[in-house]
Swiss-Prot record:
Residues in cross-link Tryptophyl-tyrosyl-methioninium (Trp-Tyr) (with M-253): W105-Y227
Post-translation changes: Formation of the three residue Trp-Tyr-Met cross-link is important for the catalase, but not the peroxidase activity of the enzyme.
GO molecular function, one term: heme binding
Quaternary data: Homodimer or homotetramer.
List of catalytic residues: H106
Any Pfam family hit: peroxidase
Entry-linked NCBIfam families: cat_per_HPI, PRK15061.1
Gene name in the database record: katG2
GO cellular component terms attached to this protein's record: cytosol
Uppermost EC category: oxidoreductase
Function: Bifunctional enzyme with both catalase and broad-spectrum peroxidase activity.
Protein name: Catalase-peroxidase 2
Cross-link (Tryptophyl-tyrosyl-methioninium (Tyr-Met) (with W-105)): Y227-M253
Site (described: Transition state stabilizer): R102
Length: 739
């Protein structure tokens, strides 16, 4: 059979198997490599959302498309949608606002600080597993309600932006003044590979250490939840224990106690919970598990109407406020105006109602005007009253409505924008003017930048400063590689490597770093004193240029004359603009590019290399060439020699690959150093090299070896240098959202 006929035959087989119930497919499941070799290093994180996956093509630039959008027209359309109830999914109280607030919140609320993953950017709520999480029940309908608007504006607004904007408009349509909105969230085209936990069942919780602490980087207490179980930890209705979990999980989203209280109290001012029936008897499969005829919708409810007064979502039932479609103080007034006792929803879930039947007719029914109900609270709501810190905040907010309103506005803005990175990425006319500390502010460029002649002169001064090639490369890499593309934080801009906490990170070799920075600061000061026409250069630029001229020098010594691109314009942040605790989570526990690994790392050295490369948005070839080049440049953390497979360190040669692939070397585990390997001459037994697993994986892993062979070939030197410079420049400019 010709290979070209296989795809069409496969399509025919698929169609026939689907027609007959899928039996043929079930019998022909392919056993993949991961089954046979589960310990094999997984490179797929470096192949996510490739440009080829984007149907808009490589010439499409979302920022430009968004700038052509009439944002006011979009908001007008969204506002109209709020009260245009659809028969297939009617709105509660005649208003979709609370439903869309939940959608936006749950889109953004999966963000977590430890790895920067989650959040609204990418529009990941559309994909598995988030689109089928138990905590996201029925949000498939919210996105489907939005489709006509997304269809109308097409490529000009992403799903990520649209969901957040809709949450804002929902709040505004119910009388709340939001803090602002920024566009700029570029959509993904596939599910992001995220460690959401190892549990094999929804709502299971096997993510705590022996001390009972939630494992990093998890942001929720149970599989499939955004934060906590609203009924209490693992369903136990203990408000104080719930408060402890709330504080932990919201803290993992970068929220302090005041922001946490504002979000919960503000969010629960609107809408209601849905638990009209027992979900086990009424609700069908989630979207991912539903048939093709469901067209991406799930949780089909066979009880009653299947919606409206028969809706089943969380299993909890009722509203917190008397007017659930308006901004009021009723949530806090009710929280403190009643004593609360436990009861069960019609679905059998634990919730709280006023004691002694009080308030029984306060809350209107969402669909039947002839009915009224008592307000309800979750265990997680009662926690805001019983926990001492939360109680102080809620009582203060109750007495100061304007303070509460501003706190919720700012907390909502932070919730929905935390994963976007610095303000330089914000788009649109609704961006608030105020600079917030969690945006990692950097001063705006306020002077002319240096020109090519200045750059050349500055580079020469750096090389004449007495600093070595490895020292300059290590410092530039430490500065720039702090960037993580998951939430666009870190990077060389701002020169925060000279500030707390980065200046004392172990991976950055603080003692050497202080020496290098002192010399670079002197060069910067001398150059700035001689520049004309108001021109200046920042230390951030000097650090990057220092690494770049060092690479040029190292390439020349390897016989290749090159020019490393350099674009000035970075600025220097101050310590006051740097939240130490916020930046602390960026500290690397491992950096395979520098052969640094600490025992605090959550995975093996090779796996942590993939994680770091993924954070830097690198491809497999880019990661490979950078590791080989940085080893040749002797850029390991603290100057360790593992993996420096060359007799001329500090030279940009392809020796790492040549010597790694050399069959005259036999590798074995060191008997003296844990986690270290020794390379001995096969004939003499003489020790030639030492290495870490990160070094050796480029010869042992079949795919990485294939790339290594390209750079280790006799004609590989020039390609190696050129590719290294491209990858180096990519990392140095990873946070340059201004170019």
């Amino acid at each position: 059979m010709k290979k070209s006929t296989i795809p069409s035959m496969s399509a025919l087989t698929l169609a026939m198997s689907l027609a007959f119930g899928g039996a043929a497919i079930a019998q022909e499941q392919v056993t993949g490599n991961q089954f046979w070799w589960p310990e094999q290093l997984n490179l797929s994180p470096l192949r996510q959302n490739a440009v080829e996956s984007n149907p808009y093509g490589s010439d499409y630039h979302y920022a430009e498309a968004f700038k052509s959008l009439d944002l006011d027209a979009v908001k007008k359309d969204i506002k109209a949608l709020m009260t245009e109830s659809q028969d297939w999914w009617p709105s509660d109280y005649g208003h979709y606002g609370p439903f869309f607030i939940r959608m936006a919140w749950h889109s953004a609320g999966v963000y977590r600080i430890f790895d920067g993953r989650g959040g609204a950017a990418g529009g990941q709520q559309r994909f598995e597993p988030l689109n089928s999480w138990p905590d996201n029940v029925n949000l498939d309908k919210a996105r489907r309600l939005l489709w006509p608007i997304k269809q109308k504006y097409g490529s000009k607004i992403s799903w990520g932006d649209l969901m957040v904007l809709t949450g804002n408009v929902a709040l505004e349509s119910m009388g709340f003044k939001t803090f602002g909105f920024a566009g700029g969230r570029v959509d993904d085209w596939e599910a992001e590979q995220v460690n959401w936990g190892s549990e094999k069942a929804w709502l299971d919780s096997k993510r705590r250490n022996e001390k009972g602490e939630l494992a990093k980087p998890m942001g929720a207490t149970q599989m499939g939840l955004i934060y906590v179980n609203p009924e209490g930890p693992n369903g136990v209705p203990d408000p104080l224990a719930s408060a402890k979990e709330i504080r932990d999980t919201f803290g993992r989203m970068a929220m302090n106690d005041e922001e946490t209280v504002a979000l919960i109290a503000g969010g629960h001012t609107f809408g209601k919970a849905h638990g009209a029936h027992d979900p086990s008897k009424c609700v069908g499969a989630d979207p991912a598990a539903s048939g093709v005829e469901a067209q991406g919708l799930g949780w089909k409810n066979k009880c009653g109407k299947g919606h409206s007064e028969d809706t089943v979502t969380s299993g909890l039932e009722g509203a917190w406020s008397v007017n659930p479609t308006a901004w009021t103080m009723q949530y806090l007034e009710n929280l403190y105006g009643f004593d609360w006792v436990q009861t069960k929803s019609p679905a059998g879930h634990i919730q709280w109602i006023p004691k002694d039947g009080k308030g029984a007719n306060l809350v209107p029914d969402a669909h039947d005007k002839s009915k009224r109900h008592a307000p309800i609270m979750f265990t997680s709501d009662i926690a805001l009253k019983e926990d001492p810190s939360y109680r102080e905040i809620t009582t203060r907010f109750l007495k100061n409505p304007k303070e509460f309103e501003l706190a919720f506005a700012k907390a909502w803005f932070k919730l929905t924008h935390r994963d976007m990175g610095p303000k330089a990425r914000y788009l649109g006319a609704d961006v608030p003017a105020e600079m917030l500390i969690w945006q990692d502010p950097i001063p705006a460029l306020d002077h002319p930048v240096i020109d090519n002649a200045d750059i050349k002169a500055l580079g020469n001064k750096i090389l004449a400063s007495g600093l070595t090639v490895p020292e300059l490369v290590r410092t530039a890499w430490a500065s720039a590689s702090s960037f993580r593309g998951t939430d666009m934080r870190g990077g060389a801009n701002g020169a925060r490597i000279r500030l707390e906490p980065m200046m004392n990170w172990q991976a950055n070799n603080p003692k050497e770093l202080a020496k290098v920075l002192a010399k670079l600061e002197k060069v910067q000061k001398d150059v700035n004193s001689s520049l004309k026409g108001g021109k200046k250069v920042s230390l951030a630029d000097v650090i990057v240029l220092g690494g770049s001229v060092a690479v040029e020098k190292a390439a020349k010594e390897a016989g290749v004359t090159v020019s490393v691109p350099f674009t000035p314009g970075r600025m220097d942040a101050t310590q006051a603009q740097t939240d130490v605790s916020s930046f602390a989570v960026l500290e690397p526990t491992a950096d395979g590019f520098r052969n640094y690994y600490s025992k605090d790392s959550s995975h093996s050295p090779a796996e942590m290399l993939i994680e770091r490369a993924n954070m830097l948005n690198l491809t497999v070839p880019e990661m490979t060439v950078l590791v080989g080049g940085l080893r040749a440049l002797d850029a390991n953390s603290a100057g360790v020699k593992h993996g420096v497979f060359t007799d001329k360190p500090g030279t940009l040669s392809n020796d790492f690959f040549v010597n790694l692939l050399d069959m005259s070397t036999k590798w074995s585990k060191s008997e003296k150093q844990e986690g270290i390997y020794e390379g001995q001459d096969r004939k003499s037994g003489k020790l030639k090299w030492t290495a870490t697993p990160v070094d050796l994986v480029f010869g042992s892993h079949s795919e990485l070896r294939a790339v290594s062979e390209v750079y280790g070939a006799q004609d590989g030197q020039d390609r190696f240098v050129q590719d290294f410079i491209k990858a180096w420049n990519k990392v140095m400019n990873a946070d340059r959202f201004d170019i």
